[in-house]
Amino acid sequence: YIGGGTPSSLNISELTKLFEIVKLFNLSKIKEFTFECNVNDITEELIDILVKNKVNRLSIGIESFNKDKLKFMERYSDFLDVSKKIDMIRNKGINNINLDLMYAIPNETLKVLKHHLNLILKLKPTHISTYSLIYEDYTKLSLMNTTPIDEELELEMYNYIRKKLSKKKYNHYEISNFALDGYESLHNLNYWNNNEYYGFGLGAHGYIDGIRYEN
């Protein structure tokens, strides 16, 4: 699993070097190889190098298609652009695609959430991750003096997402994650099953021999 952060911001030369390092390890038993992408970084050249290096799952940060929400998060997503890129990704052989949806943004309404969840569903991802906005201390967001949405509305949004995705045959297998049958993330399940994992890179976490560490 390559991410979080935004590894897709690396240029092709940097990605080539990264995959050279990854190949130093025995990957013969790897069933799921995920790479996180910012939708704006996705190009044919990027997908080609991922396919060449056996990446078989993408996690794409859509977050929203609402201009006000995206402006608040300093992001950009256009539905038609995203749709074309996902078609291109599938045509190149990667069919296991997760899309992220952020909700509970200041001033967001349930109506806005419903509309954008429907757009996400039109893209037919195999997996959907939904995250409510969290205000972390000392971050730019926490210093903006914005007012979080009402907790009751946030709960209503969460319950709507849960029920809507269940009707669309997505299994709610983990707090924030929903998957079509057979597409539950092995990476996520590894955490939930309290299994071991190595974390490489700045700020990465790992869990070995009952000890959790942070770089």
Which residues does each predicted region cover?
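C-terminal scaffold of the Radical SAM
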Residues: 1-215
